[in-house]
Amino acid sequence: MMSSNPFHRINISLVILPSLFLTAYYLFASFPRSPIPPIIHTSLAHLPSSSPSWNIYPENFYNGGAYVNLPLGRARILVRYWLIGPENGRRVVLIHGLSIPAIVWKDVAPVLASRGYRVLLYDLYGRGYSDAPQVTYDTTLFTTQLALLMQHVKWDNAFIVGLSMGGGIAAAFSAHFPHLVNGKVAFVASAGIMESGDISRTAKFMSSPLVQTVTALPPFQHYMRRLANASKPAELQEILRLQSAHLPHYNAAVASSLRDGPIRGLHFAFQELACTSNQVLIIHGTADDTVLYKFASKIRDLVPQADLVTISDGGHDITITHASDVSAALLRFLADNYSYKPAQMSLA
């Protein structure tokens, strides 16, 4: 039977408590190991010269190309960018989308440059000629990448144009770094406010961590390389397949972007944009089956001052299929004498 003597209980406490305290002190008073830099995976730049990618999308696809090492924690990420157009031109940033790198602007960027704009293009982390850090591809990762790149090229601000997921990046960038936006933001076939139900079951399955683990295994990668080298689809489809087959972290980067990135949940960014003096343009095709046309109207509901240019029968790749229409709309919008017109424009 336990003693009811209070002095006995005190003596036991005096023996046990210091021991417990010392144990806890040594267990919890030490810091964990120093943070480990993320693993960095290579880009198209490391493929052999025999790879078809060098013919489709070489490093010098645009003039004025260069690399920069951008900081990410304790790591440095190699990023490819291009500056085209006159050095004293009005500055425009073009942000590509989820899977296709800066080649997607091939029929738009030169038009802007020829009309006197200084255009900055770049490959997002994990795409094209930019390395792929093994991290979560969330919105902050992409907005910070652009802010660091603009700092590197010594741009105080610029007009911001985003395509597809790049539209989500443009919206979040405007919210995170409003001082870097020079009064104009354009969204082309823009994502950013899609809901989980708007993403196909197949896309959700393929972007799951389990599937990504399987597809990273050497046998699957070998199969994808053979498939990519044997097939000759359209230009953009081929660069997509080559990235998927040859870049070790491309599929995981795309999957993480789909799960965690600027595809969904950016209503707040568009709402914040509505509270600024920025002029806003939305360009969207009625036949877009990737980011449905309804999202153009939903974005406009969030940003009432936005102009909406509707491209009749335009799909998701309108910078390729309707490049002249997109270029014309952007040139009108970026001009100094642009003024908002309440009635939407429709391009047949």
List where the protein language model places each region.
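Active-site loop/oxyanion-hole signature of alpha/beta-hydrolase fold enzymes
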Residues: E59-N60, A66-R74, R80-W82, S114, ...
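Conserved HGGG/HGGXW glycine-rich cap/lid loop of the alpha/beta-hydrolase fold
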Residues: G73-Y129
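Short alpha-helix in the alpha/beta-hydrolase fold that links the catalytic acid
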Residues: F268-F270, L292-D301
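Catalytic active-site module of serine/aspartate enzymes centered on a nucleophile-bearing elbow/loop
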Residues: S3-N11, P304-A348
